[in-house]
Amino acid sequence: MNLDDKSLFLDAMEDVQPLKRATDVHWHPTRNQRAPQRIDTLQLDNFLTTGFLDIIPLSQPLEFRREGLQHGVLDKLRSGKYPQQASLNLLRQPVEECRKMVFSFIQQALADGLRNVLIIHGKGRDDKSHANIVRSYVARWLTEFDDVQAYCTALPHHGGSGACYVALRKTAQAKQENWERHAKRSR
């Protein structure tokens, strides 16, 4: 600090007096301070519904096939002939958390170009158990995705009635590669 700066500082501090007892100062935190919430932009687009639900009885296996999909595809899916490329475990999760997880999982699977995934929703002992409510919501949510072609109850070694296989639509790139592969064979 040069001499001019020091004299300016002393002039500015001329009438300042030190606190006599600094221990008497207490800071009170302001009330209703909320931690900034991180907005999950992916969840802003979440279209999955959580309204009124028709509970699917445990005795009824989960099964859905989009119109236009060949019956053979569902048969192969049901018999576990398609390898599972990813799985999602929803066991003991609240319904709203399951909703977010299913949405993110399917979106990520589509972005990664996956075709077949497994969702483990659990199974309860009665129709109104939490696991069966989640199971019923999963069945509803999967039909709300245009890119879900089919789903069905998994085989026992993959979770049986506590899980389901999901077949996703091919991406445009996968369709193009498939077309090129088959076009080369026909020449």
Swiss-Prot record:
This protein's superkingdom?
A: Bacteria
Any one GO molecular function term: DNA endonuclease activity
- Tell me the Pfam families matching this sequence: Smr
EC no. given is 3.1.-.-
As recorded in UniProt, coiled-coil segments are: none
Query: Which top EC class applies here?
Result: hydrolase
Cited function: Has DNA endonuclease activity. Binds DNA.
NCBIfam families, A to Z: endonuc_SmrA (NF033154)
| Protein name, entry field | Probable DNA endonuclease SmrA
Tell me the organism: Escherichia coli (strain K12)
**Gene that specifies this protein:** smrA
